[in-house]
């Protein structure tokens, strides 16, 4: 049975010293270590920085001071040195005392986290520098036992990695399944059997989209004279719509398509909520971290852009094309990164509109997104998008079908998430059981 003994990490790990200004000629020829991801992969970059630098040599153990507790540790395997910001530290290791792979596993183990929490002020919330790492006391077995442990861990982790690959494949399948459901709904395939039982009734908006469209136009023109959009070409009709449906442009069935203020308001500590694309989380509006503006400024902004219950909000920048159905009754204001779509809710079912606009956004092409450095979805592009408009009764049936299917998909998704969490726990338990 091997004997475990307490040692300081500094007994076998030595910091590679040297600190350089970012414009120092000694490092000008080197590429830069951009980041170490949580899987331990090193990413190299040519991006400049003004932060002070260190030099990392081939074979060095490199640790991210900010993310070491999340697994950002790696051995640099390049052929020539690179530089890294001082948020990283580089070490040589005495291989007669500690196996390098064993120590990498140890740094990713619960025991290492526990040592940080116990021996370093601030624990894992502190940026871990050599002065924190090297004095840490840990327990390790003899070198031969370390190498035996590495073999066992590697074998077990290989199995969990295979599980992770399977889970990632299942997650991609779920994503594709959601898109397929949406596509079949918006193309009328989900409600093919329903239409057999509910044939077209000319002049009835519930069962005739042409009549529904005429009704929508009356409502829109009663409120404001609407700008005419160009006729829809055959090339824009991307699928064959069912009998009783009608090809329309989004701008033809909406009362308003606008966006939030383009001028940054004066923020306050409280008042009226002011949201941007950053406040969309999991395809829902999340007000928990939003900004606030005064009531007087809100009233001025609300005259042009007035989100109300069941209006649609669409992210115009960042994660472009995420669609949210507003489910709150209180007033709030928008920044320019969010578009607002208002429509007549008596003629268009809110959840159907969300599905339809999300389908449109999913199929936007690169040419639809404007901008060189910062990409944006322009309102005129959104307004000109085409969709097949179903009669009112069929819109309701589409919503029922989609929600039933998405509930089943959500159940599958929860099962995959549970498997993913169990796999992560398994990886941690493997490390805990050996190191």
Task: Annotate the PLM regions.
Residues 22-31, 118-120, 192-198, 226-234, ...:
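Short coil/turn segments at secondary-structure boundaries
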Residues 204-249:
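Cys/His-rich finger/ribbon microdomains and the adjacent scaffold used
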Residues 4-52, 65, 70, 232-233, ...:
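Low-complexity, Lys/Gly-biased intrinsically disordered segments
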Residues 1-20, 135, 139, 143-147, ...:
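Non-catalytic DNA-recognition/assembly elements of restriction-modification systems
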Residues 69-76, 320-327:
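Short, Lys/Arg- and Gly-enriched loop/turn segments at beta-strand edges
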Residues 63-64, 314-315:
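A generic structural signal for residues embedded in beta-strands
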Residues 1-3, 157-200, 218-221, 225, ...:
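Short amphipathic coiled-coil heptad-repeat segments
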Residues 5-20, 58, 78, 89-140, ...:
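Basic, amphipathic alpha-helical recognition segments used for DNA target recognition
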């Amino acid at each position: 049975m091997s004997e475990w003994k307490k040692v300081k990490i500094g007994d076998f790990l030595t910091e590679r010293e040297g600190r350089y200004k970012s414009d120092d000629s000694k490092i000008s020829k080197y590429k830069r270590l951009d980041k170490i991801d949580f899987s331990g992969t090193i990413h190299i970059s040519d991006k400049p920085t003004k932060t002070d630098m260190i030099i990392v040599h081939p074979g060095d153990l490199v640790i991210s001071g900010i993310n070491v507790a999340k697994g950002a540790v790696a051995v640099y395997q390049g052929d020539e040195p690179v530089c890294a910001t001082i948020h990283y530290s580089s070490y040589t290791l005495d291989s007669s005392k500690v196996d390098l792979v064993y120590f990498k596993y140890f740094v990713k183990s619960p025991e290492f986290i526990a040592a940080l929490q116990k021996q370093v002020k601030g624990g894992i919330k502190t940026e871990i520098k050599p002065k924190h790492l090297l004095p840490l006391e840990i327990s390790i077995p003899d070198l031969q036992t370390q190498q035996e442990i590495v073999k066992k861990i590697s074998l077990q982790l290989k199995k969990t990695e295979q599980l992770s690959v399977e889970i990632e494949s299942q997650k991609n399948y779920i994503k594709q399944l959601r898109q397929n459901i949406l596509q079949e709904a918006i193309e009328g395939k989900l409600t093919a059997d329903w239409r057999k039982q509910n044939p077209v009734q000319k002049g009835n908006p519930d069962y005739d989209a042409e009549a529904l469209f005429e009704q929508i136009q009356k409502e829109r023109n009663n409120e404001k004279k609407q700008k005419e959009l160009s006729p829809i070409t055959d090339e824009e009709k991307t699928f064959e719509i069912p009998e009783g449906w009608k090809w329309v442009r989004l701008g033809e069935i909406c009362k308003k398509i606008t966006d939030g203020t383009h001028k940054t308001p004066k923020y306050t500590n409280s008042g009226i909520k002011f949201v941007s694309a950053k406040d969309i989380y999991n395809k829902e509006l999340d007000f928990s971290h939003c900004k606030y503006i005064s009531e007087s400024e809100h009233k001025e902004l609300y005259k042009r852009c007035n989100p109300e219950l069941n209006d649609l909000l669409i992210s115009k920048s960042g994660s472009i094309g995420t669609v949210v159905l507003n489910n709150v009754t209180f007033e709030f204001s928008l920044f320019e990164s969010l578009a607002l779509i208002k429509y007549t809710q008596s003629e268009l079912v809110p959840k159907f509109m969300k599905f339809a606009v999300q389908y449109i956004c999913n199929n936007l092409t690169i040419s639809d997104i404007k901008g060189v450095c910062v990409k944006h979805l322009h309102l005129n592009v959104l307004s000109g998008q085409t969709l097949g408009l179903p009669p009112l009764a069929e819109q309701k049936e589409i919503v029922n079908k989609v929600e039933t299917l998405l509930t089943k998909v959500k159940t599958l998704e929860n099962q995959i998430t549970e498997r993913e969490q169990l796999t992560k726990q398994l990886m941690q338990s493997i490390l805990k059981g050996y190191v």
